[in-house]
From Swiss-Prot:
One of its GO terms (molecular function) is lyase activity. This is Putative Cys-tRNA(Pro)/Cys-tRNA(Cys) deacylase EbsC. It comes from Enterococcus faecalis (strain ATCC 700802 / V583). Its EC number is 4.2.-.-. Belongs to the prolyl-tRNA editing family. YbaK/EbsC subfamily. Gene3D superfamilies: YbaK/aminoacyl-tRNA synthetase-associated domain. It is an enzyme of class 4 (lyase). The keyword Disulfide bond does not apply. Pfam families: tRNA_edit.
Length: 164
């Protein structure tokens, strides 16, 4: 009897399932040159605004702060600092990402990090019933309700993107 191939679950997927949150999983071929949210949107055939990227910053008072923003927008560090109660925040050095979060560049999910950090989801997420974030592994994404992300991360909506 042939064994059924089992899908490897990430920490993010296990946490979502543990809390009985409905989600949809996406897989795509990735490369080191194509880790951007735009590349993911193109690979999946989904509008760029629904693909959200997870950025990890460091606040002068709070330490690590997680920002989840639309892939087609940029993080406003001043707005994130204000929302998180810091005087300033700066991007976490890439070399520190895995040690801090348990995830690597291109596979960083806001869900299931090593520790729970203050998490801010861009208010733009409220216009969608579901958004897509990294599942915690390159080439894997999960789609779930923005409110579910906030619940799983104890996060909150905030105005944290640059407005053109």
């Amino acid at each position: 009897m042939a064994k059924k191939k089992t899908q490897q679950k990430t920490n993010a997927m296990r946490m979502v399932e543990q809390h009985k949150v409905p989600y949809k999983e996406y897989e795509f071929a990735w490369s080191e040159d194509h880790l951007s949210a735009e590349s993911v949107a193109e690979s999946l055939g989904i509008e760029k605004g629904r693909i959200f990227k997870t950025l990890v910053t460091v606040g002068n008072k709070t330490g690590p702060v997680v920002a989840v923003i639309p892939g087609n927008q940029e993080l406003d560090l001043k707005k994130l600092a204000k929302a998180s109660g810091n005087k300033k925040v700066e991007m976490l050095h890439l070399k520190d990402l895995e040690a801090t979060t348990g995830y690597i560049r291109g596979g960083c999910s806001p869900i299931g990090m090593k520790k729970q950090f203050p998490t801010y989801l861009a208010e733009e997420a409220q216009q969608y019933s579901a958004i897509i974030v990294s599942a915690g592994k390159r080439g894997m994404q999960i789609e779930l309700a923005p409110e579910a992300i906030l619940s799983l991360t104890n996060g909150q909506f905030a105005e944290i993107t640059t407005k053109e």
